Amino acid sequence: MPVPPTLSLDAFAAAKLAGLDAAGLRRRLVPTARTGGARAERDGRAVVSFSCNDYLGLATHPEVVAAAHAALDRYGAGSGGSRLVTGSHPILAELEAALAARKGHEAALVFGSGYLANLGVTPALVGAGDLILIDELGHSCMWAGTRLAGARALPFRHNDLGHLEDLLARERARARRALILTERVFSMDGDRAPVAEILGLARAFDAWTLVDDAHGLGVVGPDATAPLEMGTLSKALGSYGGYLCASRPVIDLLTSRARSFVYTTGLPPASAAAALAALRLIEAEPARAARPLALARRFTARLGLPEAQSAVVPVLVGEAEAALALSRALEARGFLVVAIRPPTVPPGTARLRVAFSAAHEEAEVDALAQALLDLGAAA
């Protein structure tokens, strides 16, 4: 008698989960409530969080929260439709204009998330017969968009300008169009791409460049501006959503061609209003933006690590189980520093990803550094 489909599906899932358990790679949801500043309650335990991407502490800023409340009261909870039907509410137009101005571009387009932005932009611009050159450590959503595009895709070694130039010299003439993908700040390593130099190579070989600025906006100082500047509203801006800034013709094309924009509901008014308020605070309070990097550098100096380039500092551990054990030991001491394991990072490079916020106190940073030293996790 054949096995009912639901039973075979459950058996498949159970076998896969057993494999993940054996490798220390199973993921679990843990209830976590932010309680003010950099503090949180994690599964009932009070902790200082060093795993939150709210780099400027704006998610709970009174002006940001008030803007979200006002939009909620005026426009309701949801946008009511896709952007091309009824979901393009007035706050989105304001937000897009502010993002474009911040990035020095003519226009911007807000997506449902940063992941959706990368998922939609690349396939809308390149396809079969074209070439994509992507940094090997590019975010998962950059790779997902690359695969959807159907173009020939070649990774270049991380931040290796020589390798990128070699690939362009060898492959560019075979393709109609070429697109280079990189991140301004790499999310798991915290290092920065040589954007100006990449743009120079792009000009020399008639290639376009998309820079993912998800972890840079509002945290690291401006550098060269790419023709395609993508980012998120969920990190330094403390809200939710994604965006692309570009020329007006490119934005107009994406409005019609980016499937992850066309076929999804518009961002809720409250999320857009919160992001807009946060963006205005960043413009008005430049000192706030300098604090996460300063704290990150204080931390790396105390641990003898290479000087931080961003608000993200990796503490490399190696194997997944060891990273999990170190994370648990820190949590027992009152610090939330989540272990990052494959496939998010390459095998053998499991780590603690330490994220710094303007909401952290220097004493909290020093205490975390000392805890890591006490646990033998740093030099």
UniProtKB/Swiss-Prot annotation:
Record keywords, A-Z: Acyltransferase, Biotin biosynthesis, Pyridoxal phosphate, Transferase
Catalysed reactions listed for this entry: 6-carboxyhexanoyl-[ACP] + L-alanine + H(+) = (8S)-8-amino-7-oxononanoate + holo-[ACP] + CO2
PROSITE patterns: AA_TRANSFER_CLASS_2
EC number: 2.3.1.47
Class of enzymatic activity (EC top level): transferase
GO biological process, one term: biotin biosynthetic process
A Pfam entry, by short name: Aminotran_1_2
Source superkingdom: Bacteria
Residues where N6-(pyridoxal phosphate)lysine is found: K235
Disulfide bonds: none
One GO molecular-function entry: pyridoxal phosphate binding
Listed pathway(s): Cofactor biosynthesis; biotin biosynthesis
Binding site for pyridoxal 5'-phosphate: G114, Y115, S187, D212, D213, A214, H215, T232, L233, S234, K235
Gene3D superfamilies assigned: Aspartate Aminotransferase, domain 1, Type I PLP-dependent aspartate aminotransferase-like (Major domain)
Cofactor(s) this protein cannot do without: pyridoxal 5'-phosphate
Role played: Catalyzes the decarboxylative condensation of pimeloyl-[acyl-carrier protein] and L-alanine to produce 8-amino-7-oxononanoate (AON), [acyl-carrier protein], and carbon dioxide.
Entry similarity comment: Belongs to the class-II pyridoxal-phosphate-dependent aminotransferase family. BioF subfamily.
Assembly information from the UniProt record: Homodimer.
Name used for this protein in its record: 8-amino-7-oxononanoate synthase
Species of origin: Methylobacterium sp. (strain 4-46)
